């Protein structure tokens, strides 16, 4: 068995531990940050700017003539990793398909944006609305009519966000 030699005595280490150098370094760091300009945002009164790619509440869009854009291709339903979208469709008299049911369960949705990216006609979009709530679970279950109402109400903001994001697409 070999004996372990004790570490040699060092005045430098003794001075560091005795004089509490690390403590004063920490206090200096705290002191430097204590007098800097505050960056806290007082949320309800002040709002930070949102990115054009911010993903908030979903909306269904319409064409300028008032017809809904969704062609019931069901790509958004297929690509949704959280299985939050439910679509049912039927054929019209002219042979085109349209949705009879388009539901999004926001309690399941992870706001990944895959539904928006997969839509070939830009029907489903995610708005910049993030201030919404529900008092019970069913309040966060959006039907086709509710999604169309959101799209109609915020069409100007949606179009502006799409235009700002166009250079990145």
Curated annotation (Swiss-Prot):
UniProt-annotated binding residues for [4Fe-4S] cluster 1: 70, 73, 76, 119
InterPro entries: 4Fe4S_Fe-S-bd, 4Fe4S_Fe_S_CS, NADH_quinone_OxRdtase_chainI
MF terms (GO), sorted A to Z: 4 iron, 4 sulfur cluster binding; iron ion binding; NADH:ubiquinone reductase (non-electrogenic) activity; quinone binding
Coiled-coil residue windows: none
Record: residues binding [4Fe-4S] cluster 2: 80, 109, 112, 115
Catalyzed reactions: a quinone + NADH + 5 H(+)(in) = a quinol + NAD(+) + 4 H(+)(out)
Keywords carried by this UniProt record: 4Fe-4S, Cell inner membrane, Cell membrane, Iron, Iron-sulfur, Membrane, Metal-binding, NAD, Quinone, Repeat, Translocase, Ubiquinone
Compartment(s) where it occurs, according to its Swiss-Prot or TrEMBL record: Cell inner membrane
KW 4Fe-4S (keyword) present: yes
Membrane topology classification: Peripheral membrane protein
Cofactor note: Binds 2 [4Fe-4S] clusters per subunit.
Domain of life from the UniProt record: Bacteria
Residue ranges annotated for the 4Fe-4S ferredoxin-type domain, each copy included: 61-90, 100-129
Role: NDH-1 shuttles electrons from NADH, via FMN and iron-sulfur (Fe-S) centers, to quinones in the respiratory chain. The immediate electron acceptor for the enzyme in this species is believed to be ubiquinone. Couples the redox reaction to proton translocation (for every two electrons transferred, four hydrogen ions are translocated across the cytoplasmic membrane), and thus conserves the redox energy in a proton gradient.
Family as reported in the entry's similarity comment: Belongs to the complex I 23 kDa subunit family.
Quaternary structure note: NDH-1 is composed of 14 different subunits. Subunits NuoA, H, J, K, L, M, N constitute the membrane sector of the complex.
HAMAP family (alphabetical): NDH1_NuoI
Name of the protein described by the UniProt record: NADH-quinone oxidoreductase subunit I
Record organism: Verminephrobacter eiseniae (strain EF01-2)
């Amino acid at each position: 068995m070999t004996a372990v030699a004790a570490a040699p005595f060092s005045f430098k280490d003794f001075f560091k531990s005795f004089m509490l150098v690390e403590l004063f370094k920490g206090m200096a760091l705290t002191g430097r940050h204590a007098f800097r300009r505050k960056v806290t945002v007082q949320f309800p009164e002040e709002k930070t700017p949102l990115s054009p790619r911010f993903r908030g509440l979903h909306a269904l869009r319409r064409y300028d003539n008032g017809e809904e854009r969704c062609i019931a291709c069901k790509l958004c339903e297929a690509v949704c990793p959280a299985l939050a979208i439910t679509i049912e469709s039927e054929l019209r008299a002219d042979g085109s398909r349209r949705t009879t049911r388009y539901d999004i369960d926001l309690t399941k949705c992870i706001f990944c944006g895959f539904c928006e990216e997969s839509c070939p006609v830009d029907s489903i979009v995610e708005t910049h609305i993030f201030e919404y709530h529900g008092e019970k679970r069913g309040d966060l279950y959006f039907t086709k009519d509710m999604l169309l109402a959101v799209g109609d109400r915020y069409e100007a903001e949606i179009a502006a966000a799409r235009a700002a994001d166009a250079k990145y697409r």
